[in-house]
A protein has these predicted regions:
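Polar/acidic, low-complexity leader/linker segments enriched in S/T/G and N/D
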Residues: 1-45
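Oligomerization/assembly interface segments of phage tail-like spikes and tubes
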Residues: 51-76, 122-135, 276
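Solvent-exposed loop and beta-edge segments used for protein-protein assembly and interaction
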Residues: 60-64, 89-91, 102, 120-124, ...
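Long, hydrophobic/aromatic-enriched structural stretches that serve as scaffold segments
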Residues: 62-111
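Beta-strand elements of well-folded, non-transmembrane domains
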Residues: 70-74, 101, 114, 132-136, ...
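Short beta-strand and beta-hairpin "edge-sheet" elements
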Residues: 94-139
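Short, charged, solvent-exposed linker or helix-capping segments at domain edges/interfaces
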Residues: 138-146
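Intrinsically disordered, low-complexity segments enriched in serine, threonine, and glycine
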Residues: 145-302
């Protein structure tokens, strides 16, 4: 069951509308919402002259159309409530919709297509049409998977038997080159891979063990572009999200596009439902790498 909808306009102004309850400040009451299920798909096929039926070619999801019906209450007047709908649902502007249900919190982004109030009705209300060019809903929080961990080992009381040798141990860093991302979403999604170097590294290779996909970073190309390969302090961010694919290097506060340093046959990883096992290696300096993978959960409907 849907509990509430939080609307945030392009100016960052927001209002949270609980289903079945009049929001006292805005005077808005949700009576109906359409378009929250899976979006309609286009299935592209080709007719065969000599065979029955068609041959499947491809498929894609259409844009999503969410229609919200609002009833106006006293805030302090009906006119104020109607004008608040213009404020929170500005025509042609982008807004964020955050849906809270019994077992899911997700968000979608869209543009207000129309706001059509019935001004002269005894029960004044409006229908607001929102076009979501991205038909999916996304989790609010990101899943973060670390390939390293830090274990504190310093304890009180402590003893230092030497003033010359470093005998005190403050902590241990544990590195793992293989970890599993468990994905629970309805549709495939990309990931963001963050690589932090604490020392020199040569030629990094990342694997998706389940799909046999490979992504390689050629440090010789990186050296040609920047003067160095991967060195201590470097941060490399790889995004495999559709529509946002990128590879950037952050070095000494300067952000550089290094997508040309990827192998030409590189695969752009996508998470499938269930276990997704990732592994990384390097020709030299793999112990100098700290990996982190983040992803959002993608839902087909609320």
């Amino acid at each position: 069951m849907i509990k509430s909808v939080k609307v945030t306009n392009y100016l960052g102004e927001s209002v949270q509308l609980r289903l079945g309850e009049l929001e006292p400040k805005s005077g808005l009451l949700i009576t109906n919402i359409e378009g929250l299920g899976p979006a309609k798909a286009n299935i592209n096929t080709t007719e065969m002259a000599t065979n029955d039926g068609d041959v499947y070619n491809s498929s894609r999801l259409q844009k999503r159309n969410i229609v919200i019906t609002l009833r106006f209450g006293w805030a302090p007047t009906i006119e104020d409530a109607r004008q608040n709908s213009y404020k929170y649902f500005p025509i042609k502007r982008r807004l964020e919709l955050l849906f809270e249900t019994d077992n899911r919190v997700c968000k979608a982004y869209g543009y207000v297509e129309s706001n059509e109030p019935n001004i002269f009705s005894d029960e004044s209300e409006t229908k607001i049409s929102i076009i979501c060019v991205d038909p999916y809903f996304y989790s609010v929080d990101e899943n973060v998977l670390l390939f390293y961990s830090m274990e504190p080992t310093f304890e009180f009381p402590f003893e230092n038997d030497s003033l010359e040798e470093p005998l005190l141990e403050m902590g241990n860093i544990w590195l793992k080159t293989e970890r599993t991302v468990y994905y629970t979403g309805d549709a495939e999604t990309g990931v963001v891979i963050n690589i932090h170097a604490v020392g020199p590294v040569r030629n990094v290779t990342i694997y998706n063990m389940g799909t046999r996909e490979v992504m390689k970073i050629d440090t010789s190309r990186l050296e040609e572009m920047t003067g160095y390969g991967i060195i201590a302090g470097d941060d490399i961010t790889i995004s495999t999200i559709r529509g946002k694919k990128s590879v950037y290097l952050l070095r000494n506060g300067v952000k550089t596009n290094i997508i040309n340093c990827l192998d030409k046959q590189a695969d752009w990883f996508q998470l499938a439902k269930g276990d997704n096992v990732f592994n990384y290696t390097a020709e030299y300096g793999s112990v100098n790498l700290q990996f982190r993978i983040t992803n959002q959960i993608v839902y087909e409907g609320v």
